């Protein structure tokens, strides 16, 4: 098991109060494979550095998880298939 930090940028038209519960459904992949979710932090709506899918703003969320590499890969795949997710970035924390 490794530590990861996942940043997700969501469609700005979503209601910010529904972001954490909707991310929680994706995080069941991590919990189902024996991983743990340390933190889910919703930063709120922020301006993007450049336009993504005709949006100039996005709702940022940062998630800290401890999981196997295959589990995180599956989570990233599922997030990428969701139309309300504009961009994801997975970083391994605590490496070396």
Curated annotation (Swiss-Prot):
GO cellular component, one term: cytoplasm
GO biological process: translation
CDD domains for the chain: bS6
Coiled coil regions in record: none
Gene3D superfamilies referenced in this protein's UniProt entry, alphabetically: 3.30.70.60
PROSITE patterns hit by this protein: RIBOSOMAL_S6 (PS01048)
Keywords from the named record: Ribonucleoprotein, Ribosomal protein, RNA-binding, rRNA-binding
Stored Pfam families: Ribosomal_S6 (PF01250)
Known function: Binds together with bS18 to 16S ribosomal RNA.
Protein name: Small ribosomal subunit protein bS6
């Amino acid at each position: 098991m490794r530590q990861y930090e996942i940043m997700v940028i969501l469609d700005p038209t979503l209601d910010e109060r529904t972001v954490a519960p909707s991310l929680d459904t994706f995080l069941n992949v991590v919990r189902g494979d024996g991983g743990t979710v340390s933190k889910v932090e919703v930063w709120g709506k922020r301006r993007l550095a450049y336009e993504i899918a005709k949006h100039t703003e996005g709702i940022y969320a940062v998630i800290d998880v401890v999981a196997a590499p295959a589990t995180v890969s599956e989570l990233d795949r599922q997030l990428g298939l969701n139309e309300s997710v504009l961009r994801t970035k997975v970083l391994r924390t605590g490496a070396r």
